[in-house]
Amino acid sequence: MTATLALTEDLIRRRSVTPADEGCQAILETRLKALGFDCEALVSGPDDFRVTNLWAVRRGTQGKDGKLLVFAGHTDVVPTGPLEQWHSDPFAPTHRDGKLYGRGAADMKTSIAGFVVAVEEFVKAHPAHAGSIAFLITSDEEGPAHDGTIKVVEALSARGERLDYCVIGEPTSVDTLGDMVKNGRRGSLSGKLTVKGIQCHIAYPHLGRNPIHEAAPALAELAAEVWDQGNEYFPPTSWQMSNIHGGTGATNVIPGHVTIDFNFRFSTASTPEGLKARVHAILDRHQLEYALDWTLGGEPFLTPRGELSDALSSAIEAETGVKTELSTTGGTSDGRFIAKICPQVIEFGPPNASIHKIDEHVEVRFIEPLKNVYRGVLERLVA
């Protein structure tokens, strides 16, 4: 068994459902301290949702004047779902048909193990490496993410720590290892819209005001609106409704209000402020009586082609023969926080088809090549 596979299995055995870490970071800290890393635990969150974060750094011979390459990842995993639907215990790493099964196998314990072992090999080969290496690990990525990476970023920013490159171990590949990496992500802006009416008997509509009827034309206009055209890196901004709630449950009552949940996934071609203003303008034009609460989940970030993307693309092709695709598709990630203090952020990991699903898995044949790609990035950027 390879060192990467052994560490992956050890991490999968830990029932680290958000925000629990269940000792994963202690395992990493032990191995990193043995390599000369300075390790710092940053614990945050309320008593009923304590989040464990790890910042570990090994300075190169150039010290703080040299480049700093960070690996960012999360030890937490999503809940298993119905255990009876799994073909094996999700926290007992199981091999079947050339695949390693377990919760977190793809998202993202294999990536964490791969980068740790890559660093172990790299430091052995280059004990006097020039650039610096760091790990930023959290147990709150799959949850609300209020006390995870964002807290570490705030602490690093406050002390003036400069990050030059960041590789996030998210599972970005699609059909085969290395066919896609993420060099950016769209922003997320959510709204909870409550349109007010007047409740009354459904047989006497003239005595009330139906908020569903009043909201419908405005919602249709919002759904049809072209928010932007996107750009060379991002598709056009998308506006989608996720929930509509109105009524008392009775079939003979016009409701007093209706609540609509919606979400923007927006590109760098739009801003949160601009999108908000346009939504309010449409609602006001329809003369609705409404309240609207906004939540900014994250702003878009983009890493143009440069040193990090070139190093990663080159390492992928050297190891796998695959020419990777730079993409900004998909949901949000902790990259939205890290990009505030790091100019080059790229996500790369194993195929993602099984993430968050029953029988999550990673193909064993991809585990060592993943580690080798990570080592290739280290060789190219901080040796």
UniProtKB/Swiss-Prot annotation:
Q: In which pathway does it act?
A: Amino-acid biosynthesis; L-lysine biosynthesis via DAP pathway; LL-2,6-diaminopimelate from (S)-tetrahydrodipicolinate (succinylase route): step 3/3
Going by the record, the broad EC class of this enzyme is hydrolase
Instruction: Output the GO biological process annotations, alphabetical, semicolon-separated.
Output: diaminopimelate biosynthetic process; L-arginine biosynthetic process; lysine biosynthetic process via diaminopimelate
Molecular-function GO term, any one: succinyl-diaminopimelate desuccinylase activity
Reaction(s) this enzyme catalyzes, per UniProt:
N-succinyl-(2S,6S)-2,6-diaminopimelate + H2O = (2S,6S)-2,6-diaminopimelate + succinate
Outline what the protein does.
Answer: Catalyzes the hydrolysis of N-succinyl-L,L-diaminopimelic acid (SDAP), forming succinate and LL-2,6-diaminopimelate (DAP), an intermediate involved in the bacterial biosynthesis of lysine and meso-diaminopimelic acid, an essential component of bacterial cell walls.
Report what the protein is called. Answer: Succinyl-diaminopimelate desuccinylase
The scientific name of the source species is: Cupriavidus necator (strain ATCC 17699 / DSM 428 / KCTC 22496 / NCIMB 10442 / H16 / Stanier 337) (Ralstonia eutropha)
Lineage of the organism: Bacteria, Pseudomonadati, Pseudomonadota, Betaproteobacteria, Burkholderiales
